[in-house]
């Protein structure tokens, strides 16, 4: 942990929150307790050694607590009250980033982050009765992630499910899109009117299913600064997807 050698509260807080990877760890824990593997999955560029070091530092600073899993081996990491107080900081960082850092480099495109990130912004209370299945077909996927071109979003109470393999349900609508464009659309950097007009994104299938998707993902008609939620009351209460069997299958082909 970097020390600034000052009693200034800004310096003291920065010693804890401003280290590399720490804000992203806090971001994930804002959605609920995570296992070590969950955090690795959410941040594929972090090494196991670095993650272990950051978690130890955060525990020493009493920003997180470490508790054994109720079932199975391993621990869960969760925010303490001190860590919870970082939540509005993460929200403000998100708002600042949306306003001032809208460029996305090709190497930053990530279908996994896009799909699970979009999923966890869905308000579970807004899910309708019945099941709706949306298939996504992305163009412009980086070669290293070519196996992540096709996705299915299963919208059904009590929560939504993101699948990299066909779940076997009848598809109600299909989204065909350039990956970079759809990423910018989900972030609010571009609007539906523009991307549909330029045929960078196309919808087909049930109009009701398409309308539901646009509403749940809050896809804007015009560019707008969206408010992203960092709480466990939404579909990503498990943060960066929990390492379920489905998640393990995704990791296996990534």
Residue ranges of predicted features:
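N-terminal helix-turn-helix DNA-binding core of bacterial DNA-binding proteins
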Residues: 8-46
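Basic, amphipathic "hinge/linker" alpha-helix immediately C-terminal to the N-terminal HTH DNA-binding motif
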Residues: 18, 70-92
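Short, hydrophobic-biased segments on the C-terminal half of alpha helices
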Residues: 55-56
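Glycine-centered, phosphate/nucleic-acid-interacting loop/turn motifs that mediate DNA/RNA or nucleotide
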Residues: 62
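Amphipathic alpha-helical dimerization/coiled-coil segments
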Residues: 88-135, 207, 224-229, 235
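Low-complexity, glycine/alanine/valine/leucine- and proline-rich hydrophobic stretches
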Residues: 135-193
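C-terminal interaction segments
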Residues: 168-254
């Amino acid at each position: 942990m970097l020390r600034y050698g000052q009693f200034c509260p800004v310096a003291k807080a920065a010693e804890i929150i401003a280290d590399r990877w720490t804000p992203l760890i806090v971001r994930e824990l804002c959605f609920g307790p995570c296992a070590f593997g969950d955090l690795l999955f959410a941040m594929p560029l972090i090494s196991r050694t670095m993650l272990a070091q950051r978690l130890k530092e955060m525990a020493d600073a009493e920003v997180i607590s470490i508790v054994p899993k109720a079932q199975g081996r391993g621990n869960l990491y969760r925010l303490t009250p001190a860590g919870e107080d970082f939540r509005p900081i993460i929200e403000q960082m998100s708002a600042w980033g949306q306003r001032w850092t809208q460029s996305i480099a090709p190497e930053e495109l990530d279908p996994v982050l896009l799909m699970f990130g979009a999923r966890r912004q869905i308000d579970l209370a807004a899910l309708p009765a019945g099941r709706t299945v949306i298939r996504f077909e992305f163009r412009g996927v980086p070669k290293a992630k070519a196996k992540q071109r096709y996705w299915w979003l299963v919208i059904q109470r009590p929560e939504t499910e993101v699948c990299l393999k066909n779940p076997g349900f009848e598809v109600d609508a299909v989204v065909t899109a350039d990956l970079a464009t759809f990423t910018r659309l989900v972030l609010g950097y571009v609007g539906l009117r523009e991307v549909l007009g330029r045929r960078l994104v196309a919808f087909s299938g049930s109009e009701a299913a398409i309308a539901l998707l646009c509403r749940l993902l809050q896809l804007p008609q015009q560019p707008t600064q969206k408010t992203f939620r960092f709480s466990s009351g939404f579909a990503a209460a498990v943060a960066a997807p929990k390492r379920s069997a489905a998640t393990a299958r995704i990791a296996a082909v990534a």
